[in-house]
Amino acid sequence: MQRWVLHIDMDAFFASCEQLTRPTLRGRPVLVGGVSGRGVVAGASYEARKFGARSAMPMHQAKARVGFGAVVVTPRHIVYSAASRRVFQIVEKRAGIVERLSIDEGFMEPEALVGATPEEVKQWAEELRAEIKEVTGLPSSVGAGSGKQIAKIGSGEAKPDGVFVVPVDKQHDLLDPLPVGALWGVGPVTGSKLASMGVETIGDLAALTQKEVEISLGATIGISLWNLARGIDDRPVEPRAEAKQISQEHTYEKDLLTRQQVDAAIIRSAEGAHRRLLKDGRGARTVSVKLRMADFRIESRSYTLSYATDDYATLEATAFRLARYPGEVGPIRLVGVSFSGLEESRQDILFPELDQQIIVPPAPDTDYEVGVQSSSSSESTQVEAPQDVALSMWCATQDVYHPEYGHGWVQGAGHGVVSVRFETRSTTKGRTKSFSMDDPDLTPADPLDSLDWADWFAENGETGDDE
């Protein structure tokens, strides 16, 4: 009977959560990420992607592409984690076993769809997406096929906010023209080897004989990739153990002999590990740097922060504190950076100043001012960081609470004044109020309150307030 594996991927998840909880941002180009000189984009709304902005891009580059209309929002992973738990609670209730890949995507193989027609699969997926949208307000895309590979490619084709079902008799029409790098497991090394053989597309790989594949790529990995290229994918859908550590390391053909070479290698590994950390959705407390010298000695040094963070500048600066150089340890062959002590609880969300413990605050970036301009109104929203922001307890996009106006977020702070937009998921676009920076009625707030899911938090033993 026909097997159906489905892959669900939340659309622009981090940015969608921001637009959900801050109605002012809906329909506007949102960039989620750090605003320091080395900040990177953790998520970009589809409005921002139209300008070429994307995840893992340096923030300054993304802001330049989007222009003045870009809204830069500090990540709130505590919000994204809660939204993810609620989404996958719905998915698991409908599908049973779910194989979570990250905070915003996963595989499922519903028993109810064994032997189903493509039309029935599409209907099932649409009903799932509709329930997720109704309950959480978040958009999602679903791909379906005979295995994980086809399902994941299908969800990409379904974006944004759609369903893409690939019948068995149509899967080669989808697979064959795609670049071979689209296959699971084809990295730079394997890709280069295939390119040297004249294999550029998945169809090219599928057309090889088994003997050619075994000789070129090996009997294990090679045959596995060959089967995927031919649409054969019997990997089971099963729960994954949660990662305890996220790392990336690189071995260099030539020994690293200078401080500059090692610094570049640390940045390369830190950036790669950080991309995976953002996808995971948690913050890290411990940073480790691993070195393997030319004589095969291995040295690993670690530092544990007092809180978990995903702020790249903080993590990178910590890695540099741990670095050792050829003048100290001799020629270096391998450099790796890892993040561990992974936590969903994020103190730096409530207290943004924590991320200044490791790094010296950079000079104000005069290009940081970003705005939101409504297409239907002359009213604008300025999210800004003037020169005296370092002296203020208030940071742009920080969650706050006022006893009269409720939950809101900081749009700008400076010159003794803080401007706050009061709104949550369940409100319409909120009004902006200005207060003295030392107003005793204005206090930091739990970002979870912006979701306004008090009943759900109570039912699931979680908290959505400051207590």
UniProtKB/Swiss-Prot annotation:
Catalytic activity field: DNA(n) + a 2'-deoxyribonucleoside 5'-triphosphate = DNA(n+1) + diphosphate
Annotated site (Substrate discrimination): F14
Entry GO CC: cytosol
EC number: 2.7.7.7
Localization in the cell: Cytoplasm
GO biological process entries: DNA-templated DNA replication; error-prone translesion synthesis; SOS response
Note on cofactor: Binds 2 magnesium ions per subunit.
Annotated spans, Disordered: 364-383, 429-449
Active site annotation, chain numbering: E105
Protein residues bound to Mg(2+): D9, D104
Classification via InterPro entries: DNA/RNA_pol_sf (IPR043502), DNA_pol_Y-fam_lit_finger_sf (IPR036775), DNA_pol_Y-fam_little_finger (IPR017961), DNA_polymerase-Y (IPR050116), DNApol_IV (IPR022880), IMS_HHH_1 (IPR053848), Rev_trsase/Diguanyl_cyclase (IPR043128), UmuC (IPR001126)
One Gene Ontology term of the molecular function aspect: damaged DNA binding
Cofactor names: Mg(2+)
Domain UmuC: 5-187
Keyword Nucleotide-binding: no
Keywords assigned by UniProt, alphabetized: Cytoplasm, DNA damage, DNA repair, DNA replication, DNA-binding, DNA-directed DNA polymerase, Magnesium, Metal-binding, Mutator protein, Nucleotidyltransferase, Transferase
Xref: PANTHER family: DNA POLYMERASE KAPPA, DNA REPAIR POLYMERASE UMUC / TRANSFERASE FAMILY MEMBER
Subunit structure: Monomer.
Family: Belongs to the DNA polymerase type-Y family.
Protein name: DNA polymerase IV
Species this chain originates from: Corynebacterium glutamicum (strain ATCC 13032 / DSM 20300 / JCM 1318 / BCRC 11384 / CCUG 27702 / LMG 3730 / NBRC 12168 / NCIMB 10025 / NRRL B-2784 / 534)
Lineage: Bacteria, Bacillati, Actinomycetota, Actinomycetes, Mycobacteriales
